[in-house]
Amino acid sequence: MVGDNNRRDVLKGTAAAGLAGLLGVTGTGLAQDQGQRLSWHAGGTGGTYFPLSNEFKTVIEENTDFTIQVQSTGASVENVGSLARGDADFALIQNDIAFFAYNGTGIEAFQGEAIESLRGVATLYPETIHVVTRPETGIETIEDLEGATINTGDLGSGTQVNALQILETVGITTDDFEEQNASFAQAADQLRDGDIDAAFVVGGWPLGAIEELATTTDISIVEISGDTREQVLDASPLFAEDEIPGGTYSGVDEDVPTVSVQAMIATNQDLSADTVESVTRAIFENTDALTIKADFISEDTALDGMSIPLHPGARAVFGPATTEAPTGNETDTGNETDTGMTETTTES
């Protein structure tokens, strides 16, 4: 596993220099170079990606000849780089980050550095935006975050991208708050210790780090609702309405309206179609063996929100994917959000 400090250094370099240098490195993760062992990059241990990836590992190993090595990472943006280099065969990423990477837009790390080798395998479940705080901070709306100390997620992560998008939507820029960058588990510790006022945490509920925090510390979750939610939805069609059910976390008894993106499995175009088809069938023919987000993961919805071209191996399982792909509109900070929709058939 890459250490947090080393990973942060790598991501800082990526953001500063783009991915051009990284793409010239040939990795060793692709299955055809590794026999039957596949590398699967997940996310932090306090989120949903890591435990779900380990459930996928069990299902795949029980139903194919492959063995799976699951690696904890900084999640979406870092995982895109791993797929591009060939260091990972499969990875979990957000569908909005996949779109930005494939099109070379949206965030600084990808500007002008389109990752055209990125391919989709399947979408999975809503990645719910949690804005977690403590009741004593008095933070009740997104607008109240101005002037606060906020953990926006690991540097370069999809969580950080979403956090800055949402804050910018209500007129809060990085000059208007003190930003901290750490994993979900570290963010929970910071909230518990009073070192930050709020944290953005993006993932399928319930998130382990927040569940654990709520057992020892009073928490509240900030609503993204009303006009604010409409502004966020208008800023990017890759956001969708969502809700955290009351009782998901101790002490949070009422439903919390919010927004979400979509979790997806991605791969590299160079991975063989047979390998991708075998892994995909193993997962989607054995969803009854899953316990995490199992209600959302099905063959019927596996192409919902697919934002990049589908790998031929996945197309053999699901058929062609005709999706609505966004077109970009640049914002004041240089990040691109999406205001238009263009139909794209993602078949290759």
Name each model-derived stretch.
Residues 1-348:
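Hydrophobic alpha-helical segments
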